[in-house]
Amino acid sequence: MEDVPEEEFPTPSASPSSIRGVPSTRKAASIRTLGRSSADGSSSASRRTLSTSSPALPGTPKEGGKSPRVAGTLQRVRSSPRLPHDTEVEAAPSTMLYWSKAPVFGVIPMRTMRAHTVTLVDTTAWLFGGCDDKECSRDIFCFDTETMQWSRPETMGDLPPPSRAHTATLVDRKIVIYGGGQGSTYYDSVYVLDTITRRWTRPNVTGSKPPPRRAHTGVLYHGKIYMFGGGNGMTALNDVWTLDVSNMSKLRWDELQTIGRKPSHRGYHTANLIGNIMIVVGGSDGKDCFNDIWCLNLDTLRWTKLIVDAPHRRLSHTSTQVGSYLFIVGGHDGTRYRHDLLLFNLVSLAFEPRSTLGKAPSARGYHVTLLADSRLFLFGGFNGSTPFDEVHILDLAAAAYLPQVTHFDIQLPE
């Protein structure tokens, strides 16, 4: 089977809450607690925007002095807030979700934010890889979610090859890259970036390794990264593997034998870790675009399909946990790219309509979203012809979502 056109995947975000699968009805049980949720590469892939009013970039020597960069950290630049301004957009009420375009500056990634990964470490988002319409990148960029500044840190060591549709999983302060590919090449390699030392390593991994793949997903649970699905260039996959990262000097692969009916072979899906449950939304096998939602209990390894009213077909979308909701943004529905926001309630196990104000991002897929300081950041994407290099922000409106349900039980159907 050939992969779906634009064979890149967004990387899911995982933000654990407490969910336990209990065979019963499809409605949820008790809500117990309310509270606040808690490389080196070509320089052609970036551009530098400078102005006399912008602060110096991290690592740029001060005039007559040494570099302000502190070893092992990203130097934060103090600057006045840079606020978006658009006379055509009305101010949003405090209880509404509000889209705006981030006023970014610095060394900006150009045309490669498509099938890339973005991993949040403290307040810094680390971007790796991605592609334009010609080639893939192996560059690293950093985005400060407080100052909106892009920078390009120097990295060293055993650099990974240019890649798209890989996974990037945060383990302590290290980013573990697995799989991906470029052109007709699919990878089965593991690389680790230490965000403190900025050194890449390619560790030895014991055990039988999974087949090369891209467009898969990975979530971290109890010291293991659970990989699901993807494609190998000939067929879509529905296998589950674990990469044991509990000891970073002794990584190990294992294939899992799951229980019950499995999801069909797929890629372009998303996977979120909610407590001990991995929730898989949508995806494609190269022919069909799926609208189903599956749950894998990572303690019992049992698959369960959720019965959802008015499901939505999606591939190359993103899914981010915000309290007791999954925020599903964009993607492709099998016919066209979408720009809408879907909210899936993890308590009622149902989609809820929700409107937004401001200027929403245009229709796209293969973007990345992540949650930082009660804001949902959207990075890049692709609409079938144009890769985007912009950053959008969805303000989640504290009055509407905080405090919110952060500890809850889910009752899965048998």
Residue ranges and their predicted role:
Residues 1-414:
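Kelch-like beta-propeller repeat domains
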